[in-house]
Amino acid sequence: MADKPTKGLADVVAASTALSDIDGHAGRLFYRGYDIHDLAGRTTFEETAHLLQRGRFPTRGQLADYGAELVRGRALGALAETNIPEIAEKQAPMEALRTLVSLASGDDPDKDSNSPEANLRKAARLTAQQPVLVARYHAARTGAEIPDPDPELSIAANFLLQITGRTPSDHEVEVFDACLVLHADHTMNASTFAARVCAA
């Protein structure tokens, strides 16, 4: 006798990952085994990004090195930078970010390497550049003048500085940093899942 067919997507495994685990029934989210409730508001986005990208929480020294890598990684190459005004005129925000990330990859010094070390460097640069790309896109759409990224500020603080044009309060940074931690990973975007279903 054949197995009873599964209705809908119940018990269907769409992907395997060591990064995050979602228990929808219990309303729980884990990053590399850590409950999101233990991370959000207690760790920084930089610590969480290190955990997701490198598999472990950073020591103080590793966090300082990773933070310096992120600061260096904020610099945009000419390919993305020069195209922001035109993209801001023609594309909606998510389309623009997709396009700008693709353009930024064209200037990436590790673009022709797929080694694990190069991929970690690319992940750090992508993490650092996306907030800058979004802020520059926003400025191009609104005509706002924005400050350059401040190497002394976190990703959350820098993004708020560049979007608003003013130094954010500690409370604003804490709230936005927690938001970044909460949204750092959720296994697979709905659009990616839909594309995989269509391709199957």
Where are these regions (language model features)?
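Hydrophobic alpha-helical bundle cores within soluble ligand-binding/oligomerization subdomains
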Residues: 1-200
